[in-house]
Amino acid sequence: MEGSEAAQQKDSVKVVVNIRPLITPELLLGCTDCVTVTPGEPQVQIGPHVFTYDHVFGSTGSPSSLIFEQCVHPLIDSLFRGYNATVLAYGQTGSGKTYTMGTNYTGEANCGGIIPQVMETIFKKADALKDGTEFLIRVSFIEIFKEEVFDLLDASHAALRLDSGSVAKATAPARVPIQIRETGNGGITLAGVTEAEVKTKEEMASFLARGSSSRATGSTNMNSQSSRSHAIFTISMDQKKTSSASDKLSNDDYDILSSKFHLVDLAGSERAKRTGADGLRLKEGIHINRGLLALGNVISALGDEKKRKEGAFVPYRDSKLTRLLQDSLGGNSKTAMIACISPADSNAEETINTLKYANRARNIQNKAVVWSFSLKINRDPVTAEMQKLRSQLEQLQTELLFSRSGSAALEELQLLQQKVSLLELKNSELNHELKERELSYEQLAQSALAAQLEKDQLMLKIESARNGKSWDDIENTDTDQDVEVMKRYILKIQQLESELTRQKFSSTCKNDLHDRFAMDKDLLLDDLGSGCEVGTPDASSAVNFRITPVPAGEADEEKERDHSSMQDKLDKELQELDKRLQQKEAEMKEFAKSDTSVLKQHYEKKLNEMEQEKKALQKEIEELRHALTNITSSTDESAQKLKENYLQKLNTLESQVSELKKKQEAQQQLIRQKQRSDEAAKRLQEDIHRIKSQKVQLQQKIKQESEQFRSWKAAREKEVLQLKKEGRRNEYEMHKLLALNQRQKMVLQRKTEEAAMATKRLKESLEAKKSTRDTYGSASGSGIQALMRAIDDELEVTVRAYELRSHYERQMQERAAISKEIAKLKECPQAMSPSARSSRISALENMLSSSSSAMVSMASQLSEAEERERAFNGKGRWNHVRSLPDAKNTMNYLFQLASSSRCQQLDKEVMCKEKEHLICDLKEKVVALNGRIRQLETQVKDLNNQNMLLFTAISEAKNPVGTSRKGTVGSEDGQHYAMRKSIRASHSLHYSKNSFLWSDDMDISDSEKSEGSDADWEASDADYGASDADWECSKKVRRRRQTVSSHLNPNPGSGTTQKSAKSEMASQEKSTSLDLAPQCCSCSKYSSCKTQKCECRASGSHCGGDCGCITSRCSNRVDMKEEKEGGGVVEVSSSDDVDDAKVQEIVKEGVMLLENSMSEKEAQETKSRKPLADIGNGVVKQTGAKPKQRKNWRKSTVQLVPSAPPLPPTAPQNTEPVPRNRDIPLRLPRAMSSPAVDSIPLTDRNAAKPDESMSSNKENVTAVRARSPARPRKNANEKENHLR
């Protein structure tokens, strides 16, 4: 191992944050980016929370494409060094975990993700190292679905699939869950999981795609392809070094390394309310959240340094997910955690929780070690060094022991150790040499076989040539079949010979035979006798006889073991060979007969020839001898010469005869050898038959013995099992008794300790009570008040959290409505003027930005509230209750709170019913007023036509009489008086109609509105829409002007002459201002009308009584004295008559009733609420914070003022004012209140929806939305644009 690795001991979990971009649904809802990344630093900020991690990708940080290079690639290097590695993706649903990991791989080249890059990198490194290392790579793919582990690569079972993202159907047969097992060294393994061996990247990718298609997915409101299970893709790799034996002996490194790479894609945490899950989806989400909760508990337990040092319990077994990730979290693995988050402000709460869990995971310490397959142990560098030191210590201890006893034993031990090492080295060398000799033997056997075949082929050709065949016929003869037959026979003979030789001799004996034969050749010749030669069969048989008793030694034992191991294989081979031998024996005999007959004929023919030649030579010799005897009797010289010649010839013939004898002997010897070979072949066949019969007998005997042994073994095993069972029972009883005894001892000890502790607690409680009485006083003193304050604080926190949650959800809904309105304004630009539309869009965008910041802050508070609730849930909430009186006081106070809340609920229900009756009465009045409006609409149309004619007549009359107006004033008074009266009547009707239109805006009945009123309202609205800058002021002044004119408008139905005269005089005075200013301005009461923004000044006329400005400030008005001089003096009373006063009183009472019914519920006087962070749960004595006055928001009201009714309205019978709400000292959580009470204000019900048309928005212009306390106060322009 390298030095850096040896120095490495513990490694923290690397935490990476990946921020995905905003997706289309979030952009349509108007979501904004609420996550901020510090430039150049791995730091994330969301609201008031700031987190620091190892790496941050996405948003303004590093690009997400660098996750693999910076975080995952170092883990692959560690994988090749023998360490386990894990990459897991964590986050809420829809945050991009599956996309980041690449689990949804389909085989396409453009599919991104970490897993495809891991596969490519692993095979690239394996190809680069394949010269010195052999790799075995396997993959497995599992999922945890509903807390059950399933194999995604199991081809025998159909995977669970989802159709159309909603209905889950399983094809038969059903999947079988995989069991989790624990190994002896504490590791986790899966029983029966499929581990497929892969050679290339394409094979691994195909398994990944197959498993991904089988994974359980579903559709929710937050994600159309939501993963419904946790998936773990595991890559197992074994490495084996291919160096030489000497290198292995000198190198102390591991020969086989085994490592695993876990790629985990977790299912996202989800809220059922946001995902809209129900039925099966809800159950799946519950299981997902349960597993993630267990994972969070494990991360919290491992991330707490104090608990880790104390060795606190880690709940790995709470979930199968945490049990499978046991090595990855705090175990034998190098781990990287990728926290995937969404930057949308609508997911701010889930994002904060994810970042908190990721921050805790940074504190987890893993201890990764190398797994050595040959040693079957984890090899940690530190542990290996300790083991080495221990061995040295043991050696030194043994040396010390031997030194005390004497030095001879130590020296002998060292010598023995050296001998053992030398023998082991020699044994390895001999084994290596044996393998080389076996290879050379196989090569020589193959060459001998080829030579034998070639020799036999040549013999056949020679025999054919001797029989008289021509060379062409011999070449054309198809000898391939004969050669094949011969080859098979030779191979079979060699196999049988080798089998016989293997049974008799061993390879070591043969080597010793050759060595001894070379060394003691003379000694063997002396033993065999002078008549036997070395190469004869007798000599060979003698040699065999002498060498047979030589012991085989260790080689014999090895061969016997090899034979016993190979005997089973040979049995099957021999059974097949028996059939083939029976078929080939006939052919072998025929071939042998044909060969022997040819040789026999050849040798007999040769013998006959030699016999004839021998007879001829003997006859000639006899003749020569006879002639020689005759010659010896004569003494002639010629006879002497002839005798010499005959002797010479006789010697020659005798030498020829001796040569022929030798040849005859040689031929006879060959014949004898042939006979011996035939006899050997017969003996060989007999041996084959005998071996076969012995084999059958042995097989039967083995079978019988095996059956007997099996029955005996079964009986013995049964007996042993019974004995073991009885022993286990006895052992169980013994352990039970021991455990019982131990428990009794422990109980006794615990009872003693409990008694001591109870005595101690009793003393402490008595002292605490005494100190409490001294501190808090009596039972009705400040102690009970402290308990009540603590309970009030707890209830306040709960109510505050509930309000935050509901306000958060309402804020999301309002923002969605604003986003839709912005989209509608952008899609339909012709609905408004460009400047108004741009101002409206900018105002809505400002509202979106403020809403986003408010949502982020609320999400932060909700996250803190949930953490506090988890921390104080259970016993922690009641730690301040230390005695029975405290508990009684607490219960009494809670009972009082519950009873008072019920009574308040009943009071509220009664008040709601009363207000509902009032609303019904007001609705009836509104219906009656709408009927009056319909009657007056026909009169308005006629009077509008008359007004147009009167305006034209007045304008024509002004031009010719401009210079002579002073002289003709008196004659034209009557005509002007009549015209002014008509104009005033038309305007009074027009304003009364408008006031009724305002009241009709609150009509929630089913009565229809006339088309004429809508048209008139649109026309009047168009007159005031000329100036976009003064749009807000015109609306407000118009509403105020209409109310004032309605109050001042005379009642034509009164029936008195005096009122008619006063009405005519008022209309005459107003007509003068109308002559001067036919178009009324919409300036505010603080305006001086000095600029062209005033419509009256812009049109060249003067402001009148119907304008929004006031006389004391306006500079565009004519002096009242000039009016009196030019138009006559008309007294106008500043107050109305008695009948008008009665009508106004009745109208005010109706308006008061309507305001009380439409206004929001009055704020109850509750105790001042504190922030969530300031409310503690453990301290009882803390005093409450200073009361903080709640902000009183201005309420928008609508006044309903009828003008010119056909009949004088009668006052309602019930004129008593609506009773005010009583002061209630305590407000319970909204979750405890009755759901039947409708707390939505009436103005919110009648408010215009964003999706309605522009005309309905204009009609409902007076509907004002109730403001939220968290929303900042808008300016007048934003409010007016929102009302539209």
Curated annotation (Swiss-Prot):
One Gene Ontology term from the biological process aspect of the record: microtubule-based movement
PANTHER family tied to this protein: CHROMOSOME-ASSOCIATED KINESIN KIF4A-RELATED (PTHR47969), KINESIN-LIKE PROTEIN KIN-4C (PTHR47969:SF6)
Protein's gene: KIN4C
Subunit structure: Homodimer.
Record-annotated Kinesin motor domain positions: 12-364
The protein's name: Kinesin-like protein KIN-4C
Gene Ontology CC: microtubule; microtubule associated complex
Lineage top rank: taxon: Eukaryota
Basic and acidic residues composition-biased segments: 1158-1172, 1275-1284
PROSITE patterns reported for this sequence: KINESIN_MOTOR_1, KINESIN_MOTOR_2
Family stated for the protein in its record: Belongs to the TRAFAC class myosin-kinesin ATPase superfamily. Kinesin family. KIN-4 subfamily.
Coiled-coil region: 407-445, 561-711, 911-950
Organism: Oryza sativa subsp. japonica
Record comment regarding domains: Composed of an N-terminal domain which is responsible for the motor activity of kinesin (it hydrolyzes ATP and binds microtubule) and a central to C-terminal alpha-helical coiled coil domain that mediates the heavy chain dimerization.
SUPFAM superfamilies the record matches: P-loop containing nucleoside triphosphate hydrolases
Keyword ATP-binding: yes
UniProt xrefs under CDD domains: KISc_KIF4
Amino acid composition bias (Polar residues), ranges on this chain: 1043-1070
Keywords linked to the UniProt accession: ATP-binding, Cell wall biogenesis/degradation, Coiled coil, Microtubule, Motor protein, Nucleotide-binding
Gene Ontology MF terms: ATP binding; microtubule binding; microtubule motor activity
